From Swiss-Prot:
Compartment(s) where it occurs, according to its Swiss-Prot or TrEMBL record: Secreted
GO BP term (any one): defense response to bacterium
Primary location group: secreted
Stated name of the protein: Maculatin-1.1
Residues with the Phenylalanine amide modification: F21
Keywords, alphabetical: Amidation, Amphibian defense peptide, Antibiotic, Antimicrobial, Secreted
Known role: Maculatin-1.1 shows significant antibacterial activity against Gram-positive bacteria, less against Gram-negative bacteria. Maculatin-1.1.1 is inactive.
Lineage: Eukaryota, Metazoa, Chordata, Craniata, Vertebrata
GO cellular component terms given for this protein: extracellular region
Tissue specificity remark: Expressed by the skin dorsal glands.
Amino acid sequence: GLFGVLAKVAAHVVPAIAEHF
């Protein structure tokens, strides 16, 4: 569902942000 999509997006966004900081 929508939560699954949100979790997938977060799984990619969080590491990407972590790389910059």
